[in-house]
Amino acid sequence: FISECIAQTRHLIGTDKIIGLRISADEHEPDGIDAPAWLQICKRLNDNSELDFLDVTVGSMMGPGGSVHVVPPMQIEHAYTTPKAGAIKAVMDKTILVAGRINQPQLAEEVIAAGQADMCGMTRAMISDPEMPNKARNGQLGDIRACIGCNQACIGHYHMGVGISCIQNPLSGRELTLGPHTKTKKRKRVLVAGGGPAGMKAAAVAAQRGHSVCLCEASSQLGGQALLAQLLPGRSEFGAIVDNLHQEM
C-alpha cells in the first residue's frame, strides 16, 4: 500500500519534486508496528526508486503509551530516536531524516557525524529560536535560545485551539503584532521589579530597544520560580530558561 501511494504521488507531481515518507519507527503500543517490523518494511522500501528520503520518528496517537512520543516532553532524553534511525539507515540507501528532542545544532551535528541520519528535524527548536540556523552559521552557539521541551505554548496551545507560540519566545506566533523589535525614538529609564523569567525578558527587550534598564530582584539569584520548577522530577530542563535569558541580558 505504501508503495502504491508513493507511485501515485510521483505520477501526480512529476519527476522534478522530492518525495519523503514520515514513519514511526516504533509506535510504542501493544498493537502497533514495532522496530523490527519497520526494519523489514524499510528493506522493501529501499528498492523504491520513487522515494527520495525517509523521515524517522517514534510513537503514535493510538494510546497514551505512544502519544507521549508524538511531541516528546523534557523528561525524555535528547536525540533518543536516533538509534532507531541509525538502524534503518543501515538497511537503506535513502536519505534519512530523524526528529525527536534534537534541540541544538551541535547535537544535530553529532547525530549526523555518528552516521545515524543525514538530516535532523528541529521544529520546536525553530519556534523557540527562529534565528538558530543563522546563529549556528555565524558561530554564535551560546546565543541560541534552546527549546526545553516544556510543550506549554507550542503543542499545548495547539490542543487549546489557540495560536502556537513559545514560553521563551513571546514573539513566536505574534510576529505581525509584536515584532521585530525596533529601536525607540525616546530613550527612557525603565525599572523592572522582579527577576523571574518575565522580568528578565522584559528587561532584555527594553534594553534591546535602547532604554536604560534597572532590573531589581530581592533574592540573590535571577530566575524566580523557574529555579524551583527545575527541582521537580523530570523537569530539570526548566532551569535552561534562566540560562537562555542570561544570554539575552
Which sequence ranges carry the predicted segments?
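Flavin-dependent oxidoreductase catalytic cores
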Residues: 1-193, 197-213, 221, 229
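N-terminal Rossmann-like dinucleotide/flavin-binding domain of flavoprotein oxidoreductases
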Residues: 226-249
